[in-house]
Amino acid sequence: MGMESSPESPQPVRVVLQAVGGWIGRLGRIWIEGQVAELHRRGGMAYITLRDPVANVSARVTCSIRVLRAADPPPEQGARVVVYAKPDFYVPRGTFSFQALEIRHVGLGELLARLERLRQALAAEGLFAESRKRKLPFLPGVVGLICGRDSAAERDVLENARRRWPAVRFEVREVAVQGDRAVPEVMAALEELDAHPEVDVIIIARGGGSLEDLLPFSDEALVRAVAAARTPVVSAIGHEQDTPLLDYVADLRASTPTDAAKKVVPDVGEQWELIRQLRDRARRVLEGGIAREEAWLASMRSRPVLANPVQEVERKIEQVFDLRDRGRRALTAALDRAGDNLAHIRARLHALSPATTLARGYAIVRRADGTVVRSAAEVAPGEELRLRFAEDGLVAIAQNREEDEL
């Protein structure tokens, strides 16, 4: 039940804090998990700041040195532990803490199992899909580098990258790469470099270490931040056998910081060699083409027609004249044949013409209606007839019919 109070009848601080202490006391003893962010020993007591493994939340834990030493080996800063503790609320100061009764290290097998469950969950969301990974630029203008302060990883990346491409530029952000400050500092550096207008690719690099040392690079919040980045990210954490979750979400995984430098910038010597090879190949192709054309020209030049072109022209002229004469003869013969044929046809037409028959003394006899009379039997005495001769005609009257005396 809530405490009764009003502006006129408020509850004293001690009463409220005592009530809060009572509520907390009723929680009982519980197991909690976290990472040791700070550890101080004073007298016979140990004071621990325990950080949540995912969220930026921490709590104060106190225990005796005996309890601390019982967790063989005693945990140090950065260790992942589970604590059996009793919640405690100190009323005089209004502070909350846990009184640890037992501390245990999180086992390697349990850590690996949790990481695998997280990996599967993130993979199911599509954060590790190859389709969302971006290609690195061939020659980045500026490379962002997130690494430990004065670390071997930083030296490896810078030295190898500059050896390969001396003109490469870097924006370096030195951060904590293990412990409770690693995740927030790496995320802050990532956000800053991702917003940098000249940075074309970001390398997150760290040397080798134990599974616990590399845990920050399997942090869910960091993995999601890398997935959301607009700039391509290269993961170069630990050695080749180390595989934090950052390797899965990064656009490219490098086995070591040195390998990251090799994958991010090209080798100037290799590029010069490639240019030389391409230049030589182009020269060979060009020279081969010229040689083929020269051979073709030589073969054309060696042909007889090109050795004495006037002779070939004269030969063609003779062929033209010969064809002209042949055509003329053929045309003349055809015209002669056509003339003879026409004369023959004219003679036949003349022989068959009625005018020719009339010229030999014959006449055509017609009645008054124009019908031709073919026999005297067709004419009645006294009938008017019209006679047509070769050049003129006359009108006659039939009198008597005579028998043919021929």
Swiss-Prot record:
Binding partners and assembly: Heterooligomer composed of large and small subunits.
Catalysis: reaction(s): Exonucleolytic cleavage in either 5'- to 3'- or 3'- to 5'-direction to yield nucleoside 5'-phosphates
GO annotation, biological process: DNA catabolic process
Locations listed in the record: Cytoplasm
Species: Thermobifida fusca (strain YX)
Record's protein name: Exodeoxyribonuclease 7 large subunit
Enzyme Commission number, as recorded: 3.1.11.6
Family matches, as InterPro entries: Exonuc_VII_L (IPR003753), Exonuc_VII_lsu_C (IPR020579), OB-fold_nuc-bd_dom (IPR025824)
GO terms for MF: exodeoxyribonuclease VII activity; nucleic acid binding
Keyword terms: Cytoplasm, Exonuclease, Hydrolase, Nuclease
Function per UniProt: Bidirectionally degrades single-stranded DNA into large acid-insoluble oligonucleotides, which are then degraded further into small acid-soluble oligonucleotides.
Predominant localisation class: cytoplasm
Lineage: Bacteria, Bacillati, Actinomycetota, Actinomycetes, Streptosporangiales
